Amino acid sequence: QNLYFGYHLRGRYKSNTLELIDIYSRLDAWYSMAVAVKTYGLSFPEFVEQDTALVDAKGLYHILLSKPVAYDMQMNPEHNFLFLTGANMAGKSTLIKAVGSAVFLAHVGMGVPAQNLKLTLFDGLLSNINVEDNIAKGESYFFNEVQRIRNTVEKINNGKKWLVLIDELFKGTNVQDAMKCSLTVIRGLMKIRNSLFILST
């Protein structure tokens, strides 16, 4: 009998079966999202329709931390560059990842880890966070950092709205060279007014 049903589900009723599977998978995803919103106390963001990029967050925190520190931040074309500096373990990387995860969750229709979040739709999100060297290819950490930044600049020079996250820029070289390279990159990125940038060092 199972073979009989299986035969018809794969043949005569194949399109109906696929449609039911699609509906069920969507319901399962929506239910899981609803459970996550309630479990983690997430709030739904407000999307603003405008041509310029915007992220306005109140009480933003990292969703994976049990005792997170909440941040307030606002970024727009007039203030499109957030430069983070401070001692190690001060929370720079955590803030960058909190912003990135909140913006990503908002774009997939999820609640976000914040009291309130207003933002525009972004055309893309780019991160330069986990850069690695490649000994087999003879590529140093610094080389791959430069390549990632180069690829980032090439992508965002298209007039679209991007959120760009860069953690500890040029840490693969000495302090003086890192400072010179960072200043050059920052000055170039600040000219791209249609995108928002968060960079730590």
Kindly give the residue locations of the regions a language model identified.
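Extended non-transmembrane interhelical loops and adjacent amphipathic helices
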Residues: 21-28, 50-56
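ATPase nucleotide-binding head domains, primarily ABC-like/P-loop NTPase cores
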Residues: 36-201
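Short intracellular "coupling" helices and adjacent cytoplasmic loop segments at the cytosolic face
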Residues: 10, 32-38
